[in-house]
Structures are given as C-alpha cells and as structure tokens.
From Swiss-Prot:
Record InterPro entries: Glyco_hydro_1 (IPR001360), Glyco_hydro_1_N_CS (IPR033132), Glycoside_hydrolase_SF (IPR017853)
GO BP field: carbohydrate metabolic process
Catalytic activity: Hydrolysis of terminal, non-reducing beta-D-glucosyl residues with release of beta-D-glucose
Coiled-coil zones: none
Keywords annotated in UniProt: Disulfide bond, Glycoprotein, Glycosidase, Hydrolase, Signal
Claim: Cell membrane is one of the keywords in the record: no
Signal peptide residue numbers: 1-22
EC number(s) stated in the UniProt entry for this protein: 3.2.1.21
Protein family: Belongs to the glycosyl hydrolase 1 family.
Enzyme class: hydrolase
Binding site for a beta-D-glucoside: 48, 145, 190-191, 333, 406, 451, 467
Name of the protein: Beta-glucosidase 1
Length: 517
C-alpha cells in the first residue's frame, strides 16, 4: 500500500509541475506524426546476446570473471547471437526496424584489449553489419557496454589508470577504420555514470571495486576511484571523438555520442531543502558527466562537496571534452523521490558517491507495473516522467541532440504469459506518446530504441526477467525465438498503423496476433 501511495504522490507532484503541458495524452498517434529523420529501433549488447565467450579467439571480459567468480547466471551462451545473427536480422527486417543498436565486444575484436586484431572477431562484426545493411537496417554501434577486457584490468587496473585512454582510442580506431563505411552512429561509452557507480563505488558490478568494510570488495576505494574512473571515461570519449573528427568524419560522415543513465528526480515534499536536494541529485547523476561534455567542467556543487577527491580538468582537457559529443544517449527506466539528508554516512565509513550526494533517494521503477494503480494513472505517471526528463535536458543543457538508446518494461520470465505481454504494450504506447509530445514541445530528441529486441541475459539479473519484444527459450539448446504481442504492436506502429489501446484495441490486437502465429 505504501508503494501505491508513493506513486500517487509522484503523479500529483508531476501533474503540478507539468500542468502547462496539458493532459495525459491518450490520442492515437502513428509513425508519420514524428519528424522526418526521427528513427525507431531496438537494441541488445554483446555480452547479453552473443554467447560464444571462448570461441574464435575471444578472451574474457570483466563480466566473465565477475560472474564466474561469484557463481552467478552468466552470458556464456546467452542468446547464441554469435551463431544466429542472420536469423535475428531477418526478424528485425520483418519487424520493420529502421535502426539497430548493438555493442562490440572489445575482447572479441582485440583479444587482450590492445595489440593485434582477432581476425575471426573482425569478420564476425563485418558479417553482422553487412547483414544489417543488406536488410536496410542502420547499425548504431556502442564501443563499450560495461565489458572491457579482463587483461587490461589485470595489467594496469583498467579504467582506474589513464593508460586505458590510449588503448580505448586505438580500439576505436580499428572500429572506425573497419566498420565506419557502414556505421554512421557511434556511442563511445554506455551508461557511463552507472558503470562507474556500480563498478567502483558500490562494487556490485564488474570489476567489483569498492571500499571495505560495509561492502563485499577486496580491492578499491569508493572515495576516490569513482571520480577517477568517471574522469578517465570522459577523457577517453574526448580522445575518440577527436580521432573521428580528424581522421574519419569528412570521409564517413558519422557522429560520435556518449550515453548516460537518466533518472527523473522529484522532491518528496515542497520544502526548500528537498528542492535543493533534487537539484543536487540531478547534478550528481546527470550533471557529473553532462556538464563537462556541454560546458567543459564539473558542476559547482560537486567541486564544493568532493573537493580534492574530484579530478581537475586542465585547460586543454576541458576544451577537448567540451563539445566532444555529437549527441547524448539517454538510458531511462527509473524515477525517484528525493529527500534531503544533512548527514548521510557511507557503508564503509568514508565518503563515497552516495554520501557526497547527501540525500535519500526513493527509487520507483517504471519497469514494474503496480497492479493496484489504475491504468490511467500509470499511463499519466509514465507520460509526465518522460516529459520531465526530456524537458530537464532541454532546459538545463541547451537542448542537445538526444537519442533514447534504452527504454522498456521488464516482465517475469514466463514463456506462456510473456507471449501476450499487454502491460509492455501499454507502457511503450505511453512512453512513445510522451516522446512525441516532448518533440512537439521543442526537445531535440531524434530517436527511440526499445530495450530489448529479444530476451537477453540481463546484467546481474540473469534469466529471471526480460525486456524482449521476442522471447527466447533459454531451456532450448537452439534458443528458439518467438514474437510476443509487443513485437506485433511495435511492428504495426513502425509500418504506419496508429497505436490502438483500450479494451477494444487490445482485443483486436490479441486476435490479429493469434491469427498470425
């Protein structure tokens, strides 16, 4: 009951904040309502989809080591996309995808992260990209989706060491040279803020570094490494962006972006303290890396709070980082109520990212349907949360080009129930409708990618839940793919049908889906 009341509070607060935007839209819309050039796609990542972790010269990434050491579910086989990519591209074409987002496994392309290219890894990605292009699907490639080579972590501490900037730039150079004639959209780092917090502050994701006691880590320093790694990610991105502009852009005509995990923050009360805390949360989560990319330096509140533990950009570095991202990739699933806390001790007893931020964050997931909340209220919640985050980026950061690179709804992994995944359709309908509203309100949002095209190995969550438009039978050695109702809905939308919901629309959709199987 408390969760429901909290959600209702969130809806009321958002309605008050966005009364100027009008009602929660339930109007029909279609693909043609979006601007020409706006792209729709779906995505996967290498470790979550490929499998074949020890085939054809691939060597371990930090994910392989992290999961096997902890005896957790892993992506050793995952969807077996390495062997089934042609079948998957055919499904993408049948669905009507305009573009497809995927990542390259650094340790498959360059086994040790630097040095010689793995020829079989190179050929796989060439084949995959050519297959996409042959079917009229534009590749959108991420260079780093959490899974950097374990060799570099063992050799010099991975992202804690500036040496990785040179190695990452050399890896990107290979990708641009070998694939750039067919790839026009590159994202350097996926979810840079969450990769850093999870891997170096909390220690709950690879490489699993953090401060002890209080957390289960044997190495790391949450007080400093979180910010050092974030700094190195920004410098590596700037280095890669500079390389592309100097060596490839005139020939290939592509663009290079950077992606961040975005959360919609709302004050838990109308008190001044909570309003200030909400601004601080935005500065720590988004501004931490977005302000350097747009303005060339960290937010003032971070510099004041963190002090000497926050690395400093030299004048040259600031100039290189500023303006280095042609677009911002937004990963968006969550919203949160923020309460100010004057003293927020860390688990280890030393300052870390969470204690530096100085607030209590009650995260409410848009991924999980609260069944006791009326449908109309849930749709309003999704609608205004989406408007809120896109409006915030527009107003705070000069309206940069934005691609929503990940957004979707998880459901429990049940092959029978998942096939008719009506809650996912309702969620996607509300979210895409809100994106359309944001675009009409002036947001320079240029694309939307559903997460995920098919059920995947979900990072840290294994195979318990899934986001896919297509189900994958992970008990079947052949990993059979099957379309869900949401795949049918998304395909219809991409092919120009107006979205249709409500009881009559859902009944019609179920009927069409059943007859097409």
């Amino acid at each position: 009951m408390e969760d429901v009341l909290t959600l209702i509070t969130m809806i009321v607060l958002l309605l008050l904040a966005f009364h100027g935007f009008g009602k929660c839209s339930s109007d029909l819309y279609s693909r043609s309502d979006f601007p020409e050039g706006f792209v729709f796609g779906a995505g996967i990542s290498a470790y979550q989809w490929e499998g074949a972790v020890d085939e054809d010269g691939r060597k371990p990434s930090v994910w392989d080591t992290f999961l096997h050491c902890r005896k957790m579910d892993n992506g050793d086989i995952a969807c077996d996309g390495y062997h089934k990519y042609k079948e998957d591209v055919q499904l993408m074409a049948e669905t009507g995808l305009h573009t497809f987002r995927f990542s390259i496994s650094w340790s498959r392309l360059i086994s040790n992260g630097r040095g010689s290219i793995n020829p079989k890894g190179l050929q796989f990605y060439k084949n995959f990209i050519q297959e996409l292009v042959k079917h009229g699907i534009e590749p959108h490639v991420t260079l780093h989706h959490y899974d950097f080579p374990q060799y570099l972590e063992d050799d010099y501490g991975g992202w804690t060491n500036r040496k990785i900037i040179k190695d990452f730039t050399a890896y990107a150079d290979v990708c641009f040279r070998e694939f750039g004639n067919h790839v026009k959209f590159w994202t350097t780092i996926n979810e840079a803020n969450i990769f850093t917090i999870g891997g170096y502050n909390d220690g709950n994701s690879p490489p699993g570094r953090c401060s002890f006691p209080g957390r289960n880590c044997t190495l790391g320093n949450s007080s400093t490494e979180t910010y050092i790694v974030g700094h190195n990610l920004l410098l590596a991105h700037a280095s890669v962006s500079r390389l592309y502009k100097q060596k490839y852009k005139d020939i290939q005509g592509g663009s290079v972006g950077f992606s961040l995990f975005a959360m919609n923050f709302t004050p838990s009360t109308n008190s001044k303290d909570d309003e200030i805390a909400t601004k601080r949360a935005n500065d720590f989560y988004l501004g931490w890396m977005l302000e350097p990319l747009i303005y060339g330096d960290y937010p003032d509140v971070m510099k004041r709070t963190i002090g000497s533990r926050l690395p400093v950009f030299s004048k040259e570095e600031s100039e290189q980082v500023k303006g280095s991202s042609d677009f911002i990739g937004v990963i968006h699933y969550l919203t949160a109520l923020v309460t100010n806390i004057d003293i927020n001790p860390s688990l280890s007893g030393i300052p870390d990212f969470n204690s530096d931020m100085g607030e209590s964050i009650n995260i409410l997931s848009m991924r999980v349907r609260i069944s006791r909340l009326p449908n109309s209220d849930e749709k309003c919640l999704i609608f205004f949360i989406t408007l809120s985050i896109l409006e915030y980026i527009k107003q705070s950061y000069g309206n940069p080009p934005v691609y929503i690179l990940e957004n979707g709804k998880t459901m429990n992994q049940d092959l029978e129930l998942q096939q008719k995944d009506t809650p996912r359709i309702e969620y996607l309908d509300a979210y895409i409708g809100a994106v359309l509203k944001a675009v009409r309100n002036g947001s320079d949002t240029r694309g939307y990618f559903v997460w995920s095209f098919m059920d995947l190995y979900e990072l840290l969550n294994g195979y318990k839940s899934s986001f896919g438009l297509y189900s994958v039978n992970f008990s079947d050695p052949h990993r059979k793919r099957s379309p869900k109702l949401s795949a049918h809905w998304y395909s219809g939308f991409l092919k120009g049908k107006p979205t249709f919901l409500g009881s009559q629309g859902i009944t019609q959709l179920h009927s069409n889906f059943s007859s097409s199987r």
